[in-house]
Amino acid sequence: MAGTLQFDLVSPERRLASFAATEVQVPGTDGDMTAMEGHAPTITTLRPGILRAQGPSGVQAYAVTGGFAEINATSISVLAEKAVAVEELTGTVLDEFIAEARELVSVALPEDKDMAERTLNDMLALRASAGH
């Protein structure tokens, strides 16, 4: 049986999850990654996407809009800008996320435009992967 690591997911509003997980799939800015027990210490930024954690009651999935993940051999702590359990994710919530991303594109300075457009594209991909 695979070992576990402590998984914690928090947003500024609340703690969404805290349990022992066998693996956590993270939508990293530089590419998706999977954290498991024994992982090398890493800090990564998140892009909008679906975070999945395999726990005692099966896979739990959360839509995140960005943030940070700190991973070590025994735990992963995710601080998400915004996060919603996939089963609570609605078209209205996704519309709000996309509207905020569009607003950021419209006000971005030239040097920040590429990052803002990438975030918007990730939000649109999040909508597609969530089936809304």
UniProtKB/Swiss-Prot annotation:
Q: Which GO molecular function entries does the Swiss-Prot or TrEMBL record give? A: ATP binding; proton-transporting ATP synthase activity, rotational mechanism
Membrane topology for this entry? Peripheral membrane protein
Please indicate if the UniProt record lists Hydrolase as a keyword: no
Compartments annotated for it: namely:
Cell inner membrane
In terms of superkingdom, the source organism counts as Bacteria
Q: Write out the entry's keywords from A to Z.
A: ATP synthesis, Cell inner membrane, Cell membrane, CF(1), Hydrogen ion transport, Ion transport, Membrane, Transport
A GO CC annotation recorded here is: plasma membrane
Q: Which Gene3D superfamilies does the annotation name?
A: F0F1 ATP synthase delta/epsilon subunit, N-terminal (2.60.15.10)
State the family named in the UniProt similarity comment for this chain: Belongs to the ATPase epsilon chain family.
Subunit note: F-type ATPases have 2 components, CF(1) - the catalytic core - and CF(0) - the membrane proton channel. CF(1) has five subunits: alpha(3), beta(3), gamma(1), delta(1), epsilon(1). CF(0) has three main subunits: a, b and c.
* Chain's role: Produces ATP from ADP in the presence of a proton gradient across the membrane.
What is the protein's given name?
A: ATP synthase epsilon chain
The species this protein belongs to is Cereibacter sphaeroides (strain ATCC 17025 / ATH 2.4.3)
